[in-house]
Structure formats: structure tokens, C-alpha cells
Amino acid sequence: MRCFKATIAYDGAYFLGYAKQPNKLGVQDKIESALNALGIKSVVVAAGRTDKGVHANNQTLSFHAPKHWNAAKLFYCLAPKLAPHIVLKKLEEKNFHARFDAQKRAYRYLLTKNLKTPFLAPYIACGDYGSLDALNTALKQFTGKHDFSLFKKEGGATTNPKRAIFNAFAYKTFIIGHECVVFKIIGDAFLRSSVRLIIQACVQYSLEKITLAEIEMQIHNLKATIRTPIMANGLYLHRVYY
């Protein structure tokens, strides 16, 4: 068997998340079904499992295929079976593990105050976010290594809730005629819905609905003020570092 590394992008609006689902509507379901149609039976491992509605620009996968498959032939056969909602960007033969070998993961979140067309609604979140300075002040609280037990969705079990965030900041830009705030958060790994809970906390602070002290208390597992993640549609798994 040969091990392959695949880089894909996908539209999270068409899936119930990355992980396999009982109704077969997960990204993993689609990829494994496409491989199975080619006679390849393999579990597909992802660098990170995104939630329902979350997109990916550069998700990384690892899987195995029989030796008669090479990267060029497999790319040619597999890419059309994934389209249009999953795009196979790159495929190479590489002996690695997509999840365990990943060193850092970068997420981006797009948020605008006024969405001018419904056609962008699945891809840019809409809502007030206060001031850019306040957002960056709040984001700074999350850098470093912390126990993120109170920044994960219920049911997101893990044996080790400690994660390191290397960089977290926000900036403004225009995307298809919309002024947006783009959040960028880079960490070694993230718990379930952790990125969206972090961004929600920062937005609520910027809107003066919570204080920095309340954010710090939640980071230190003293009290959970933010329990509901910000909407999923603005979030993108942007890059995985190896």
C-alpha cells in the first residue's frame, strides 16, 4: 500500500461537518465513497475535523491506496468524483499522518456588519463586531498555552484540553464589495468549536457585553460566560503547517 497526502478545499455549506455522518453527509463520507468507487478502501484522516457549515481552503488528508496507483493517475481519477463542492488541489505520495504530524493549524473568520447579497450568506458571517482595537485587545488574551476546557462545545471530549495559540489578531479588508473584519488564529490544535467560542468572546467584549476579566476567568476555568459559539458560516480552515 502507498500513503498519499491530499490537499483539498471544500464548501462547508453542503456538508454536516468533516466527520462521517449516519446520513453520509460528511466531507469524509464523500471522499471515502469516491475512493471506494475507484476500488480503494481506506480510512481518510484529516488534519482537523470542521463543524457543520465550516469551510476549508487547505485541509490536509492522509490515506492509503494499492501500489498500482501513482499520484498523477489518482488525481486524474479522484478529482472529478469530488467536484464541485470538494476541490482536490494537490495530491502527492508521502508517508505521513495528516493529524499527528501537523504542527500548526490556521483558521480565518470573515465577519461583516452589512451583507448586501444573500448569495454570500453561507460564506461571510453578518453581525456587529464593535471596534477593531477592542477585538485585538481581547484576542491577545488567548495567546500562549491554556487549558481550553471552557472554550469547547459540550460533547467535544478530549483527554488533554491544553492547547497553544501562537498568534491571534484581526484586521479589516474588503471582500467582494463588503468591508469585513478577518480574524486569524494560529494554534497547535483546537478543541471542538473552540475557535468560534474564542471569536464570540472577543466580539462580545468589543460590543461591551462582557469584560476582559470575564474572558480571563473563562480562560482560567473559573467561570464560563460565553457558552454559544459564533455562527459557523464565516469560519475557514485556512492552512495546516507540517
Swiss-Prot record:
One of its GO terms (molecular function) is tRNA pseudouridine(38-40) synthase activity. The active site is at D51 (nucleophile). The keyword Isomerase applies. InterPro entries: PsdUridine_synth_cat_dom_sf, PsdUridine_synth_TruA, PsdUridine_synth_TruA_a/b_dom, PsdUridine_synth_TruA_C, TruA/RsuA/RluB/E/F_N. The keyword tRNA processing applies. One of its GO terms (biological process) is tRNA pseudouridine synthesis. Disulfide bonds: none annotated. Its EC number is 5.4.99.12. Formation of pseudouridine at positions 38, 39 and 40 in the anticodon stem and loop of transfer RNAs. Homodimer. This is tRNA pseudouridine synthase A. It comes from Helicobacter pylori (strain G27).
